[in-house]
UniProtKB/Swiss-Prot annotation:
Disulfide bonds: none annotated. This is Urocanate hydratase. The lineage of its organism: Bacteria, Bacillati, Bacillota, Bacilli, Bacillales. It comes from Bacillus subtilis (strain 168). Belongs to the urocanase family. The active site is at 407.
Length: 552
C-alpha cells in the first residue's frame, strides 16, 4: 500500500492523458486530493475530515481514472459515492462529471445506517471537497478561518488579536488552518491535538510554529509572546476534554475559545479522553458501540469546558463541527449557549455573495499562481484587505500538491477573475489551464442548521431545497464537474451541500461557461439570503439586477 501511496500525484505540464482538458483537469484534481502533501491518509483514500474520501475503494479509484481517460468531450461520467456507475452522451457544454456522495433518505440519514452501507461497500463519506476532488490542503479553509478571526478582532479587540490568547483543538485538514489564521491576525494560540503526526504536518507546512507535550511549557511560551505583543502558534499534544479542564482549574485567562476537532464523526473522528491513539484504535475495532459512547461523553465534557470559559469572560464560538449538538444529545441542555461562527461573523459576507473562490494551476508551476496573485491586485486595485491577504499568503502559505490559491470574492468579482484567468491561459501567460472551484461552505450552496444556515432570520435553517437548486443551476450553467453531498462538516443527518468546479482552458467556450457559472453560483447566495429577509441581500440583488420574482 505504501507504493500506491507514493504513486498518487497529479501530472504537471501540458501533456494530456485524457481526450480533453476538462477530463484532464478532473483526473489531476482527483489525484491531487490523494497527494501525500495534501491528504491526511492517502493510503486509505482519506483526504481530510475523519473519513472524508476521494474514492470508495482502490478498485473504484482506478476505474474512475480509466473512465476519465476514455471520456469524450460530449460525454458525462456519473459517480455514486466514490464509484463510477455510468457514462452517457450529453453535449460539450454539459459537466464532464456529476457526483453524488453519501446522500441518504432522511429517515435513514444517520451514522449507524451509513456505516452499515459502508461495510457492504455501497457508500463512502465525501465530506465536502474530498469526494468532489477540489481539496487543496489547509489553505482551502485558511482565508475563511482568517476572515472569521479578523471579524472577531474587529468586533471585540479593535481590529487585531495582538496580546490575546486563543484556545482551540483539532489540527486535521480543516483545523490545521487555525494556528496560522490566528497569527495572521497577530494573536497567540494554543491548539490541542491528540495525534502528533498531524501536529508535525502542520509544523512542516508552516501552519504552526512550535509543539510541546507540556501544558506548562505551552503556557510559558504563550505568556511570553502575549507580553511581547508577538504572534505565536503552539501545538499542544493532548486531549482537549482533559486539557481544557486543567486550564480552567488553574485559572488560566483565555480570551477566545473555539474548536475544530472531528466531532462530526464520533466513531472515527474524536478520541475519548484517557485513551492513547493505539488504545483508541483497538477499542474502535473491538467495541465500536462503547467507543462512540465514550467519545460522546468526552465531547460533552469538552463543551462543558467551553461553556465554563464563556462564564469566565472568554469569547466562545462553535466552528461548525457539530460538537454542541452531540453535547446536547448527551444531556447538556445549554450546549448552544455560545453561537456558531457563521451567524456570529460570516453571514454579512454571504449576503453579498461573498465566499471561498479557489483555483489551482494544472501546470504545476508556482509562477502561474504568482501571476494570478498579481492579476487579483490589478483587477481590484482598491481592495486593500484582499491585497493584504495575498501578500500574507505569498509569505506564509506553503503549497500542498498542485500550486493553488484561495481568496474570498463576491458576486461579479468571481466572474471578473475567472474570465481574466481564462484570458491569461489563452495568451500563454499561464503555462496550462487552471481549475476554478470553491468549498461547499459558501453563501448559497449549503443547508446546515448547526453551521452555515444556523439561526436564519426567517427560520429556514433546515430547508434543503437551496443546496439542490445550487447543484442544478451549476449543471445548467455548464460547470465542468458538479457534486451534491450529505453530511459534510457536521456529520450524517445535519447537512446537504453542493459544489462546482469550472476549467479555464483559454477557449471561447470556457469564457461562456465561466461567465454563467461564476454568476449563477454566487447569485444563489444572494437570492437565498434575500428570500430569508436579509436587507443587505435584498439591496445587493437590486444593485446587481438579479431577478428575484416575488421580492418587492
Amino acid at each position: 500500500m505504501t507504493d500506491v501511496k507514493k504513486s498518487i500525484r497529479a501530472n504537471r505540464g501540458t501533456e494530456l492523458e485524457c481526450l480533453g482538458w476538462e477530463q484532464e483537469a478532473v483526473l489531476r484534481m482527483l489525484r491531487n486530493n490523494l497527494d501525500p502533501e495534501v491528504a491526511e491518509k492517502p493510503e486509505d483514500l482519506i483526504v481530510y475530515g475523519g473519513i472524508g474520501k476521494a474514492a470508495r475503494d482502490w478498485d473504484a479509484f482506478h476505474a474512475i481514472e480509466h473512465s476519465l481517460k476514455t471520456l469524450k468531450n460530449d460525454e458525462t461520467l456519473l459517480v455514486q459515492s466514490g464509484k463510477p456507475v455510468g457514462m452517457f452522451r450529453t453535449h460539450p457544454q454539459a459537466p464532464r462529471v456529476l457526483l453524488a456522495n453519501s446522500v441518504l433518505v432522511p429517515k435513514w440519514a444517520d451514522w449507524e445506517h451509513f456505516h452499515e452501507l459502508e461495510k457492504k461497500g455501497l457508500m463512502m463519506y465525501g465530506q465536502m471537497t474530498a469526494g468532489s476532488w477540489i481539496y487543496i490542503g489547509s489553505q482551502g479553509i485558511l482565508q475563511g478561518t482568517y476572515e472569521t478571526f479578523a471579524e472577531l478582532a474587529r468586533q471585540h479587540f479593535g481590529g487585531s488579536l495582538k496580546g490575546t490568547l486563543t484556545l482551540t483543538a483539532g489540527l486535521g485538514g480543516m483545523g490545521g488552518a487555525q494556528p496560522l489564521s490566528v497569527t495572521m491576525n497577530e494573536g497567540v494560540v494554543i491548539a490541542v491535538e491528540v495525534d502528533e503526526k498531524r501536529i508535525d504536518k502542520r509544523i512542516e507546512t508552516k501552519y504552526c510554529d512550535r509543539k510541546t507535550a507540556s501544558i506548562e511549557e505551552a503556557l510559558a511560551w504563550a505568556e511570553e509572546a502575549k507580553l511581547a505583543g508577538k504572534p505565536l502558534s503552539i501545538a499542544l499534544l493532548g486531549n482537549a476534554a482533559e486539557v481544557h479542564h486543567t486550564l480552567l482549574n488553574r485559572g488560566v485567562k483565555i480570551d477566545i475559545v473555539t474548536d475544530q476537532t472531528s466531532a462530526h464523526d464520533p466513531l472515527i473522528g474524536y478520541v475519548p479522553e484517557g485513551y492513547s491513539l493505539d488504545e483508541a484504535d483497538r477499542l474502535r475495532q473491538d467495541t465500536p458501540e462503547l467507543y462512540v459512547r465514550l467519545a460522546k461523553q468526552s465531547m460533552k465534557k469538552h463543551v462543558e469546558a467551553m461553556l465554563a470559559f464563556q462564564q469566565k469572560g472568554s469569547i466562545v464560538f462553535d466552528y461548525g463541527n457539530n460538537i454542541r449538538q452531540v453535547a446536547k444529545d448527551e444531556g447538556l441542555e445549554n450546549a448552544f449557549d455560545f453561537p456558531g461562527f457563521v451567524p456570529a461573523y460570516i453571514r454579512p459576507l454571504f449576503c453579498e455573495g461573498k465566499g471561498p473562490f479557489r483555483w489551482a494551476a494544472l501546470s504545476g508551476d508556482p509562477a502561474d499562481i504568482y501571476r494570478t496573485d498579481a492579476l487579483l491586485k490589478e483587477l481590484f486595485p482598491t481592495n486593500k484587505a484582499l491585497h493584504r491577504w495575498i501578500d500574507m499568503a505569498q509569505e506564509k502559505v506553503t503549497f500542498q500538491g498542485l500550486p493553488s490559491r484561495i481568496c474570498w470574492l463576491g458576486y461579479g468579482e468571481r466572474k471578473k477573475m475567472g474570465l481574466a484567468i481564462n484570458e491569461l491561459v489563452r495568451t500563454g501567460e499561464l503555462k496550462a489551464p487552471v481549475v476554478i472551484g470553491r468549498d461547499h461552505l459558501d453563501c448559497g450552496s449549503v443547508a446546515s442548521p448547526n453551521r452555515e444556515t444556523e439561526a436564519m432570520k426567517d427560520g429556514s435553517d433546515a430547508v434543503g431545497d437551496w443546496a439542490v437548486l445550487n447543484a442544478l443551476v451549476n449543471t445548467a450553467a455548464g460547470a465542468s464537474w458538479v457534486s451534491f453531498h450529505h453530511g459534510g462538516g457536521v456529520g450524517m443527518g445535519y447537512s446537504l451541500h453542493a459544489g462546482m468546479v469550472a476549467v479555464a482552458d483559454g477557449s471561447e467556450l470556457a469564457d461562456e461557461r465561466l461567465a454563467r457559472v461564476l454568476t449563477s453560483d454566487p447569485g444563489m447566495g444572494i437570492i437565498r439570503h434575500a428570500d430569508a429577509g436579509y436587507e443587505r441581500a435584498v439591496e445587493v440583488a437590486k444593485e446587481q439586477d438579479i431577478i428575484v420574482p416575488m421580492q418587492k
